[in-house]
Amino acid sequence: MKPGIHPEYREVVFQDIGADFSFLTRSTIAAKETIKWTDGKEYPLVKIEVSSQSHPFYTGKQKILDTAGRVEKFRQKYGM
C-alpha cells in the first residue's frame, strides 16, 4: 500500500440517538466528538439515526422514521 493515501482505520463508537444504543467497531469515518467507553478509553463518537436497534426491519415494529421533517417538506412543496 502507498503511504499517506489511505484513511486512518480506527476504533469508533456509533451511537443510535433514537434507541439510546451504542456500539464499538472499527471505521475510517471522521468524527468531531469523543466519548468515554466502558473500558475507560476515549473513542471518536459518530451519532446515527438508525441502527439495528431502531430499524423496523430488525425490531419487527412498524413506525414512521421522519427525523428530518421530510413529510412536512413534501406537503409544503406540493401544497398538500
UniProtKB/Swiss-Prot annotation:
Pfam families reported in the protein's UniProt record: Ribosomal_L31 (PF01197)
InterPro entries per the UniProt record, alphabetical: Ribosomal_bL28/bL31-like_sf, Ribosomal_bL31, Ribosomal_bL31_B, Ribosomal_bL31_sf
Keywords for this protein: Ribonucleoprotein, Ribosomal protein
GO biological process: translation
GO terms for MF: structural constituent of ribosome
Family annotation (PROSITE patterns): RIBOSOMAL_L31 (PS01143)
Protein's UniProt keywords contain Ribosomal protein: yes
GO cellular component, one term: ribosome
Family: Belongs to the bacterial ribosomal protein bL31 family. Type B subfamily.
HAMAP family xrefs: Ribosomal_bL31_2
Assembly description: Part of the 50S ribosomal subunit.
Record-given protein name: Large ribosomal subunit protein bL31B
This protein's encoding gene: rpmE2
